[in-house]
């Protein structure tokens, strides 16, 4: 599993715990390796290429906070990272507030204040992010899944003919947690499985959260609903 060293938050850790707890229940013998990726890591491209060659991987964190996410997703879609002119290679993209915007091939600044995830084809918002100090708010995430063909020479005992790459990108931290809940849900398992190897699948998660009254410094939000939208 890949995380950003500088910007790993408590939300990323909650998403990590959600995923590892589920996988341990599915297979108690499963082994995990956690990898941090600092910003401007020089061998980043080489690490991305290795990731697609061996093993099953989960990458956590949006391009706002995890540079590795941008690199992995763009490698899957065979486009240059950090290139806004590549937006139309994707079905969906982030629409960020101006203070949060970063250079990304699948994200751009909002022009009217509505932030979240948009359909690239229509430009319409399909999942919204609203921040509240108390009450009900909204967040969202992108989940990208790719099945990667594994050549016979790299298979264990002639089995395991493919690797799975999963990238969970929340608009904010609670969106990443919501994405983790959707990723482990039996309800959405079929919809998150690509039809064939070599073709990445991108899906949108829409989530609501509750924030009870409390000290303004306490981030006491809890996910109340997380669902996978139909394309």
Model-derived segments and their meaning:
Residues 1-231:
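Solvent-exposed alpha-helical segments and adjacent loops
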């Amino acid at each position: 599993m890949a995380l950003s060293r500088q910007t790993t938050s408590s939300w990323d850790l909650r998403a990590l715990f959600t995923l590892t707890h589920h996988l341990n229940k599915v297979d108690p013998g499963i082994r995990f390796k956690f990898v941090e990726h600092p910003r401007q890591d020089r061998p980043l491209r080489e690490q991305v290429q290795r990731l697609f060659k061996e093993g099953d991987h989960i990458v956590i964190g949006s391009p706002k906070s995890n540079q590795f996410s941008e690199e992995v997703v763009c490698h899957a879609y065979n486009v240059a990272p950090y290139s806004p002119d590549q937006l139309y290679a994707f079905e969906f993209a982030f629409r960020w507030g101006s203070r949060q915007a970063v250079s990304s091939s699948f994200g751009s600044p909002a022009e009217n204040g509505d932030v979240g995830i948009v359909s690239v084809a229509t430009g319409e918002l399909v999942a919204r992010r609203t921040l509240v100090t108390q009450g009900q708010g909204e967040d969202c995430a992108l989940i990208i899944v790719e099945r990667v063909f594994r050549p016979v020479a790299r298979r264990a005992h002639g089995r395991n003919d493919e690797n799975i790459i999963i990238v969970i990108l929340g608009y904010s931290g609670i969106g990443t947690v919501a994405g983790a809940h959707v990723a482990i849900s039996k309800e959405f398992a079929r919809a998150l499985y690509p039809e064939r190897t070599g073709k990445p699948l991108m899906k949108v998660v829409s989530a609501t959260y509750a924030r009870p009254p409390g000290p303004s410094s306490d981030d006491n939000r809890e996910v109340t609903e997380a669902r996978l939208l139909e394309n």
